[in-house]
Amino acid sequence: MPWWPWRRWRRWRRRRGNWRRRVAPRRYRRTARRARRRRKAVRRRRRRRVRRRGYYRRYRRRRRYKRRLLILKQWQPTTNLRLTVKGLIPVVVMGKGKTQNNFGQWEQTVPLEGESYGGSFTIRKFTLQTLYEDYLKLRNRWSRSNTDLELIRYTGLNLRLYRHEFSDYIVHYSLETPMEVGLESHMLAHPLKMIMSSKHVTVPSLLTKKGGRRYLRLKIPPPKLMMTQWYFQKEFCQVGLVLLSISTATLMHPWMAPFVNSPALTIYAVNHKTYSDMSILPSNNQGSTKNELIETLYTAEHTYNPMAQRIWGNIKPQNTNFTPENYWNKWNEIHTKIKTNRQSELTQLKQMRKRLELTTENDYQDPNFGLSYGLYSPLLLYPEMYFPEQSKVYQKARYNPLLDQGIGNVVWTEPLTKKTCDYASQAYNVIKDAPLYLALFGYIDICSKLAKDKSFYLSNRVCVKCPYTVPQLLSKTNATLGHVILSENFMRGLVPSKDSYVPLYMRGKWYPSIYHQEEVIEAIVSSGPFVPRDQITKSLDITIGCRFGFRIGGNLLNPKQVGDPCKQPTHPLPAPGGGDLLRAVQVSDPRKVGIQFHPWDLRRGMLSTSSIKRMLQDSDDDESIEFPPKAWPGDPVPVGRTLEERCSSSLYHLLQEQATPPPFKKPRTEDQEENPEETTQLQLFQELQRQRELQLQLKRGFRGLVEEMIKSHRHLALDPYLK
């Protein structure tokens, strides 16, 4: 029905604002027409000259059509309350030399003494479970408890982006599902890529933009595919609310640091012509051993450097000074000393490891990979030479990030057992046609996450092919051949922390790996545009404020009986709650919410038998605290998860494949031949026990399947791709 019948009646219509009398436009007079026959006069009723009070306006009736779409609505639960989670979150904590790392993957780690911590950017997925873990760390507060109501609905997020004292940063959020990360996700978190993206917020530091408000506000709606309906907390706790990417940046000096003369840097790489076999295995497929390769590399021209002068007392002939003439003329005697010291170093290392009880059954030590006289010893790879014209076993190149167009660059990882450095075979995590500083940004972290191998840093290496260096790090004859880059500390015989002490297990396994390549990758990443390369202090941390909005609902029990207030007990301190002062509101793990009692569980003022049985079946014992935790829920999982991994835990037991158990083998005893029936009975008993376990597993799986079917029919099912 139209709105004008209920409009308030006034004698004169009120005019708003300044107004003036409208001048009538000039009337257009048409030319005279031919006279026509006069119509017959008809008597008509005179029109009312005074407006009638009340309803007088007519409106046209619209034609009715059938609705093509229906709006489905859901009834609200009996109890519907607002839940707000407010807190402060450290999104970036960065130590010196951690520009390439993702803080989200290193937040749950404990660094060694003297090592840096954190990273310059983070990719964090916020869920109800992460909010609960932050609550345990006293980083947020909940406006009310979630223990008595099991239904929840998400309404949105408000952020406060606090400005840092001297560090700028960029914020980008994603609401697309599934909230997962891939091999190129860390490249998109680079500050240059984030500035060029469509949806980003740049937060300048107080040094970059003096004055103004100390924080910026950002309002983020719920995810795109999330429906506005009620979910159970147990299933909703793993749903991604927002995927937040935050990267520190330098807006004042984006292209070059103010305290250097050039943005270019020096990159050292292994010369594939001299190192024909880079495998760490004792020999290659052709049968040639590492002894032939080490004899080829150890020459007077390759080893005449400051490192040889430093250890001259261990390799010199008797009564000989360190001069070029003595070094070249008496090289045969020096070479013999080096070979003797190589064997004695291995013997002393084995004895020391045996005394300290560090030797294992598979502890293999190759003398060709020793620290002092091996294939990659500082005697061969020392970066400084007395004469630059000397032949070197490594290649030295200059790299300018401002000239890197990315076309032709290739970065990949490969195992240490591979003979050659090429991406034609056994190459993993290959990134092509991207600038070197962009491809290596967070590259090691995402590769370690995809590999899921604890020994990833010590069993793999990073290879690079780049035509934008001088000389070019590529091969003219083989298009798939690359180079293994080296850090200066590794070439000097030092560990990445620049400590002169090298662990015993590493002295017999001195070869380039990702553990030793982190420094050169850090240097390449720090040369890129907009990265924080000119820090004033050794560390920085960025904090944001968040306010998550939820609606929590369910059915509460009937209120308790009212007692006499004069007879209530007292306590020494009149503190409200009288319990944990740090957490006035009791918050439970959302994964375990949903087994509380409801009003329909009461029968004549007592709990029913079925409700007590449900509580006993679903109650879980308190799990012990695991430190350090294996996985952090705030770190987004990599792409490529199967359907079994996305489903609930109960349904996963039904979908997972059954592993074939190994055949039963009983240890030999003297009575085995005399009592074959006992062995047969034991085998049958174990087979029966295994069948019972499979039946219980199938029972849990079918139970979860039925629960999922009921939820889907009641429109309470949760999209597994939201998790």
From Swiss-Prot:
Coiled coil residues, start to end: none
Disordered: annotated segments: 658-679
InterPro entries: TTvirus_Unk (IPR004219)
Sequence intervals crossing the membrane: none
A Pfam family it matches: TT_ORF1
Localization per record: Virion
Keyword vocabulary terms for this entry: Capsid protein, T=1 icosahedral capsid protein, Virion
CC terms in the record's Gene Ontology section: T=1 icosahedral viral capsid
Keyword field contains Manganese: no
Main location: virion
Role played: Self assemble to form an icosahedral capsid.
Family to which this protein belongs: Belongs to the anelloviridae capsid protein family.
Protein name: Capsid protein
Organism name: Torque teno virus (isolate Japanese macaque/Japan/Mf-TTV9/2000) (TTV)
